[in-house]
Amino acid sequence: MKLELELDELWSFVFKKDCKRWVWIALCRQTRQIVAFVIGDRSAATCRKLWQQIPPGYRQAHGYTDFWEAYQKVIPADQHTACGKDSGLTAHVERWNNTLRQRLARFVRKTLSFSKSDYMHEVCLRLFIHRYNLSLLPKK
C-alpha cells in the first residue's frame, strides 16, 4: 500500500488576532490520523519543522498540498503534488481543519474564546489530536 499524506496549514491566534499562529498539519490519507503537527508562522522554516516531525516511514510518502510556496521548497519534488481545493486531493485535511474549528472554540475565527498563552494553545491542540487519533482506532 502506497502511503499518501495531505498537508495543510490553518490560521489561529493567541491572545489577540494580531498574534497569528499557523497550525501545520500532516494527515495520513489511508488512516485519516494526524501524523505530525507544528505551530508557528507561515514560513518555509516552519514547514521544514513539520517535515522533520513526520515519522521516517511516512516521510517516504507522497504529499498533497495547496500551492503555498513553502511546500515546494521543503518537500522533495518527486514526492509532492500541489493542487487546488477543487481537485479533492486535500479534502481530508481540509475536513479535519473544519472539525477542529467546530469542536475547539479557541480555533474559531470569530469567537470570544481564545488562547491566552502559546503553551495552552499547543496543549489544547495536542490533546484534541490525541483524542481524534484514538477515535479512529478499531474498537475491540
What is the predicted function of each stretch?
Residues 1-140:
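Residue-level recognition of single "structural anchor" positions
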